[in-house]
UniProtKB/Swiss-Prot annotation:
Its cofactor is a divalent metal cation. Coiled coil: none annotated. One of its GO terms (biological process) is nucleotide metabolic process. It comes from Streptomyces avermitilis (strain ATCC 31267 / DSM 46492 / JCM 5070 / NBRC 14893 / NCIMB 12804 / NRRL 8165 / MA-4680). GO terms for cellular component: cytoplasm. Nucleoside triphosphate pyrophosphatase. May have a dual role in cell division arrest and in preventing the incorporation of modified nucleotides into cellular nucleic acids. InterPro entries: ITPase-like_fam, Maf-like. GO terms for molecular function: nucleoside triphosphate diphosphatase activity. Its main location: cytoplasm. This is Nucleoside triphosphate pyrophosphatase. Pfam families: Maf.
Length: 206
């Protein structure tokens, strides 16, 4: 019996962190950015917004002729702080205000995941949630962090795998979800589509 050919995998995101996590898990997707305007969507809750954005991004890329037959992964993350959905801050002033509001508190990082199987025209989607407990950086530390430019490029104005890591006391839930993609969630969604994640592994170098 011959092995089935490995399915083509496409990541509908320009996030280097998401791509890196998938590669660490043995997956090597192509990157095709959706270009979807996130301001076009609204939702009653941050979790629903994250899911709607993930589904929209996956569906936009899945509709492209060049990806037919592929599995397309779309993700989007927002921070739920007091029921408000916080994505990437618009500017340094907003990033500073966010950090002053977040310090010493906890928020929930919501990441929507959608996997679209362009071969079967089916999709599976879910939101993963991780509680993030923020430390209490000083005003000077916040100013230095904002000046680094990093918080302007990430949902919630922070990331676990960057310069804000010392300002995060801990998390409750999936570490990868906070970085941008929950690998256990990806595995479950692939399973719903009848695809085993091990079938997508790239061969190990000898």
């Amino acid at each position: 019996m011959t092995d089935q050919p490995r399915r083509r995998l496409v990541l509908a995101s320009q996030s280097p962190a998401r791509l890196n996590l998938l590669r660490q898990a043995g997956l090597d997707p192509e990157v095709i950015v959706s270009g979807f305007d996130e301001d076009r969507l609204s939702a009653p809750t941050p979790a629903e917004l994250a899911l709607a954005l993930a589904e929209a991004k996956a569906s936009v890329v899945a509709a492209k002729p060049e990806v037919q037959g592929a599995l397309v992964i779309g993700c989007d993350s927002v921070l739920d702080l007091d029921g408000e959905a916080l994505g990437k801050p618009a500017d340094a002033e907003e990033a500073t205000a966010r950090w002053k509001a977040m310090r010493g508190r906890a928020g929930t990082l919501q990441t929507g995941h959608c996997i679209y199987d362009t071969a079967s025209k089916r999709y599976a989607s879910a939101t993963a949630s991780t509680v993030v407990r923020f430390g209490e950086p000083t005003d000077e530390e916040i100013a230095a962090y904002v000046a680094s430019g990093e918080p302007l490029h990430v949902a919630g104005a922070f990331t676990l795998d960057g310069r804000s890591a010392p300002f995060i006391e801990g998390i409750d839930g999936d570490h990868g979800n906070v970085i941008g993609i929950s690998l256990p969630t990806v595995r479950r969604l692939l399973g719903e589509l009848g695809v085993g994640i091990t079938q997508l592994w790239t061969p190990r170098e000898k």
